Amino acid sequence: ETDWVITDVEPGDRRQHHYGLAVDYGSTTIVMQLVDLNSGSVIGEEKVVNCQVQYGTDILTRITYSLEDPSHAQDLRKATVETFRQLLEALTDATGINAAKCPVMIVSGNTTMIHFLLGLNAWTVFASPFAPVSSDPGFLWGEEVGMAFEGLLYIIPSASNYIGGDIVSGLLKLDIHKQDETCMFFDIGTNGELVLGNKDWMIAGAGAAGPALEGYISRYGMRAAPGAIDKVKISDGRISYTTIGNRKPVGICGSGIIDLLAQMRLNSWINMAGHLDPNASDRIVYLQDENQYAAVYATAEESETGDPLYFTQTDIDQYLDTKAAAFTMIECILDSAGVTEKQVDKCYLSGAFPAHSDLEAAITIGIFPDLPREKYQMIANTSLEGARILLTNRDRLEEMRELLENMYCVQFASVPDFLIRMQAAKFIPHTDMDRFPTIKAKVK
C-alpha cells in the first residue's frame, strides 16, 4: 500500500515545473496562491470576493438560505466553485502557468465553509449536538466537487464544529503547540476563533462575531475598497481621515469604524455606553425621520456621492454588540483554562480585520484586552500560510494529526453566563474600567 497517487503523466522531464495551490477559503474573501513546489516560493497570488455573498454577507444568513429549499445548498456550492474558477483563471492569466492542471490544492477554511463547498447541510455545524456532516473530508478530486481542476484537493480537517481547518492551519504556522510560553491565537473577522495554550495543553473556542468588524454594518459601511475611509482622527473638535486610494469617501470600512468609535470616546462625543452627546460637537446631528442622533464623519461637500456620511446611534449599538461578543470569547476561554490576562505571554492576531486596524484603537473600545502592546503580534493570514506549509512539507500532516488529538474545544453556546458577560463588554471599553488601566488614564 502507498499514500502516493498519480495525478497526471506528462512527456519529458518536468521536474523543474512542479506547482501547487494554497487556498484561504474565507467567508468574505478567498485567496489563492500558486506555489513552486521545488523552491516553496510564491509565483502568484489572487483574491476575489466569495460569490456566496449574494446569498448573505454573513454565514448564518447563508445557512438560513440553504434551509429554505433543498436546491439552495447546491446554489452555495456552485457559487463557491465559480469563485475558485475565477481564481484559477486569474492565476493562469497572471503567471502563464495553467493553474487548473496543478497536481494538488490545499484548502484551508472553517467548518461551515467546507460544508458549503461540498454541498452538505451546514446547519449541523450550529445545531445541537453540533456534529458536522464531515470534519475531515481529506483528499478529493477536483471534479468530485464540480471544479474545473484536474488535481487533488486536500481539505484541512476541523478540530470541532467551530474550530475549522483555517485555525488548524494557523496553528501550524505559529507553532503554539511547540512553545513554552502561554500563547493566545485570535483569528477574527466575520467569525472569531481562539486558541489558548502551549506545548503542554491547548484549549480552543469560537463564535460568530458578525460582519460588523469588517465594515458590513451601517448605511455607509463597506469592505476595504477604493473610497473607503480607513483611518479617522479627531483633534480640537475637527475630524480628519484617509481613504483607500486617496479618493473622495463613499463609505467607511472596519478599520475606519474602530478609529471613529475610539476617537469619539476619547473626545467625549460618546459616553461609556456609546451614546452620542449632541452638545459635544456640531458634527452630531439629529435625524428627524429616524428619531436618532448621528455623527457626520464626512460632509456632503467632501463625499463622492454629494451626501453626508454619518454613523448613527443604531450603528454604534450594533457595533458594540459585535465587539462585546469578541471580548467575551477571550474572557471565557481564559477562564476555561484558569489563566489570567496577565499570564498570557503572546497574543497573535490574525485576519484581515486586525491586520489593517489600529491596535490601540481596538483596545480603546474594548475588542482586545489591555495587555502590554509588545505582547501583541499581527499576522496577516495564518490560514493561507499554514496551507502553504502543508503544501510544501507533507511530513507536517502527521504533526497536524497529533495537534488535533491534543486540543480541547469549548462551546461558547454552552457557557451559562456568556450573555451576562457580554452585557458588561458592551460598554466602551467595559463596565470594569480597572481592566483597561491605560485607557482609563486617557478617557476625558
State where each predicted segment sits:
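N-terminal glycine/serine-rich phosphate-binding loop of ATP-dependent small-molecule kinases
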Residues: E1-F116, T124-F126, K444
